[in-house]
Design a protein with these regions (language model features):
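PRPP-associated nucleotide enzymes
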Residues: 1-175
Length: 175
């Protein structure tokens, strides 16, 4: 059991399981891309570890960029997505793969899809290491999912609770 601020968390998914899921997702994306050189777009802050490990596993040419949006305060989703940092390069005619750490309500994905719809991308794919199917009620297709998890708050591997826990190499769940 670990404590972050006022909450206690118990082990949930270990580092080996995370690495296996990311490797599996990287193979799936490689197979789907053919000769395309995708632009992987990580969603900060949470996805920095996922993106780092994903691109190390991805064996074909690719580009990497990041966007930063936020919809979390504490342990609850705020339902309002604020764009903080956008993209500088044109993505017109490119294949874009959004890499998320976690998708629960899907509000961030809706905001990102709207951003990319205006960019005239060739195709948009969505990858997430963690999906909370109970919370996800959007119509946007998720192309690559590492784990489906219960609708409980998790920390570690880039995910935080009010700033703490991102550096933990495995996933812990709220007790």
């Amino acid at each position: 059991v670990i404590q972050l601020h006022d909450k206690h968390f118990v082990p949930f998914i270990n580092a080996v399981q995370i690495n296996e899921a990311i490797a599996r997702m990287a193979r799936q994306v490689e197979n789907d891309m053919g000769d395309e050189i995708p632009v992987f777009i990580g969603v900060l802050n949470g996805a920095f570890m996922v993106v780092s490990d994903f691109v190390k596993q991805y064996k074909k040419p690719c580009e990497v960029s990041f966007v930063k949006l936020s919809s979390y305060e504490g342990t609850s989703t705020t339902n309002s997505v604020k764009q903080l940092i956008g993209l500088n390069d044109s993505l017109k005619g490119r294949t874009v793969v959004i890499i998320e750490d976690i998708i629960d309500t899907g509000n961030t994905i809706v905001a990102l899809k709207e951003m990319f719809d205006g960019q005239e991308v060739k195709q948009l794919k969505i990858a997430t290491l963690f999906l909370k199917p109970e919370a996800y009620k959007k119509d946007i297709k998720l192309d690559y999912v590492g784990f489906e998890i219960p609708n409980k708050f998790i920390v570690g591997y880039g995910l935080d609770y009010d700033g703490l826990g991102r550096n933990i190499p495995e996933i812990y769940q709220l007790q």
